């Protein structure tokens, strides 16, 4: 599973212009977290969590600082979280999380992306019941048993710990993700590849040929929208 997360990160950053879009989306997320609380990450755990994730995505420091400075200013720009669910070809399912200053624009854009790229929008809950929300932590290591014991001693609710190709992948209860990160840092682990709240599919589908091409087109159209923060899917490799 460690390889899976590495492949997903590589795929997301391989597209031309992908980095600038990732930076912009993290800029919005950092601004919102800083605006909701103290703009100091040392006293605002939600902001620190977003900044840590931004650093994992190699977002430059000046982008992070600019978003925090904007939150410190007098701007009253507000952003609203949203979730959309839908279907692609041959049993594929998609959850789209958004963060937007214009809900009507975002809803229209997401609906258009589905409609023009071989997908269908679904009602709220039509897809998400087939996914489980989990905390995911990925870092270099090979002793899954030792990590499992460490987390149990820290009273972390652990769903699974996997070791593959020199990488440890941990799945936790969503409410225990922060606790897991703290326990790992206290044990001396300081570098993380992934620290995310994810929607994990209960089962995956593999697509080939035209179905895969259609799905990639749909996925890219959604990912290219500036208001789309995260996409979850049951398609293997995404």
Swiss-Prot record:
Under the heading Pfam families, the entry gives: TACO1_YebC_N (PF20772), Transcrip_reg (PF01709)
GO-annotated cellular components? cytosol
The record's listing under InterPro entries reads: Integrase-like_N, TACO1_YebC-like_2nd/3rd_dom, TACO1_YebC_N, Transcrip_reg_TACO1-like, Transcrip_reg_TACO1-like_dom3, Transcrip_reg_TACO1_YeeN, YebC-like
Which residue ranges traverse the bilayer? none
One of its GO biological process terms is:
regulation of DNA-templated transcription
Please, which domain of life does this record's source organism belong to? Bacteria
UniProt GO MF annotations? DNA binding
Locations listed in the record: Cytoplasm
Write the record's keywords in alphabetical order, separated by commas.
Cytoplasm, DNA-binding, Transcription, Transcription regulation
PANTHER family this protein is in?
TRANSLATIONAL ACTIVATOR OF CYTOCHROME C OXIDASE 1
**Family named by the database record:** Belongs to the TACO1 family. YeeN subfamily.
What is the name of the protein in this document?
Probable transcriptional regulatory protein SSU05_0402
């Amino acid at each position: 599973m460690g390889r899976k997360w590495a492949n997903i990160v590589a795929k997301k950053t391989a597209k031309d212009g992908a980095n600038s879009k990732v930076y912009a989306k993290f800029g919005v997320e950092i601004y919102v977290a800083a605006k909701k609380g103290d703009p100091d990450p040392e006293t605002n755990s939600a902001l620190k969590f977003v900044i840590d994730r931004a650093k994992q995505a190699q977002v430059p420091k000046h982008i992070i600082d600019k978003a925090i400075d904007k939150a410190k200013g007098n701007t009253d720009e507000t952003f609203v979280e949203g979730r959309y669910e839908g279907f692609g070809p041959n049993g594929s399912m998609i959850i789209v999380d958004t963060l937007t200053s214009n809900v009507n624009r975002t809803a229209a854009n997401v609906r258009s992306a589905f409609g023009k790229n071989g997908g269908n929008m679904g009602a709220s809950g039509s897809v998400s019941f087939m996914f489980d929300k989990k905390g995911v932590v990925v870092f270099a290591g090979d002793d899954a048993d030792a990590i499992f014991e460490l987390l149990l001693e820290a009273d972390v609710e652990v769903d699974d710990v996997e070791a593959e190709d020199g990488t440890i992948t941990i799945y936790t209860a969503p409410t225990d993700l922060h606790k897991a990160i703290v326990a790992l840092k206290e044990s001396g682990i300081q570098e993380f590849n992934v620290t995310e709240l994810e929607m994990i599919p209960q089962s995956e589908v593999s697509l080939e040929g035209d179905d895969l091409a259609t799905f990639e087109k749909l996925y890219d159209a959604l990912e290219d929208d500036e208001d789309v923060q995260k996409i979850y899917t049951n398609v293997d490799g995404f």
